[in-house]
């Protein structure tokens, strides 16, 4: 039986990493074989692209950034996601295509039609079985990012106007059939209970 592809997406500070761990534990308790991955990244080539895209030492043009991320996605999809799904493994990804529309589309201002055209080339009709889009008020997200212990990457250093546009993009994407809006402003357990409801429908 084919595995399921689940994505967690949302603005910086939305708590995706903690929820991915909770999702994996839940699915494993229900007898599922699970792997986790991330975008950009997930492959050797993808991780190299991730370093380029997130490094504060580079300032790529918006379209360059988009094409790099999509190149990483093609490699990721063909060599990791699709083979594991075919083998019956459930794949949990930290970000996928909703992030591209939110960050490069709404955030950078790239025409959404361009993104859609490129998406169809790379993904054809492939979409996640479930995309949980974690949304929270901008001031809470900014505080969480500020309190992170590690050095901030290039995206985390963007201004508040950029993140407001990204949040707008995520709210729009959360209305699509494959996506579910998740209120990420509460504690980890309350957020997971929302996600759990949608997971149970996939089992």
Curated annotation (Swiss-Prot):
UniProt KW Transferase keyword: yes
Binding-site list for ATP: 10-17
Keyword set includes ATP-binding: yes
GO CC, alphabetical: cytosol
Highest taxon listed in the record's lineage: Bacteria
GO biological process, one term: dTDP biosynthetic process
Enzyme class per UniProt: transferase
GO MF annotation terms: ATP binding; dTMP kinase activity
Annotated signal sequence range: none
Entry keywords, A to Z: ATP-binding, Kinase, Nucleotide biosynthesis, Nucleotide-binding, Transferase
Protein name as annotated: Thymidylate kinase
Gene name as annotated: tmk
């Amino acid at each position: 039986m084919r595995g399921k592809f689940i994505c967690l997406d949302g603005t910086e500070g939305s708590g995706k990493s903690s929820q991915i761990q909770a999702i994996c534990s839940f699915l494993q308790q229900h007898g599922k074989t699970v792997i986790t991955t991330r975008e950009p990244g997930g492959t050797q080539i993808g991780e190299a692209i991730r370093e380029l895209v997130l490094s504060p030492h580079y300032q790529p043009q918006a379209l360059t950034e988009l094409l790099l991320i999509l190149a990483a996605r093609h490699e990721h999809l063909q060599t990791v996601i699709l083979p594991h799904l075919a083998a019956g493994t459930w794949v949990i990804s930290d970000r996928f295509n909703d992030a591209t529309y939110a960050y490069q589309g709404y955030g950078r201002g790239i025409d959404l039609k361009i993104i859609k055209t490129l998406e169809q080339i790379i993904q054809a009709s492939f979409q996640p079985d479930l995309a949980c889009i974690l949304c929270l008020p901008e001031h809470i997200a900014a505080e969480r990012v500020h309190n992170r212990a590690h050095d901030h990457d290039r995206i985390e250093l963007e201004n508040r106007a950029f993140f407001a546009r990204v949040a707008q993009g995520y709210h729009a994407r959360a209305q699509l059939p494959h996506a579910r809006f998740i209120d990420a402003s509460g504690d980890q357990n309350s957020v997971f209970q929302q996600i759990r409801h949608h997971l149970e429908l996939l089992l």
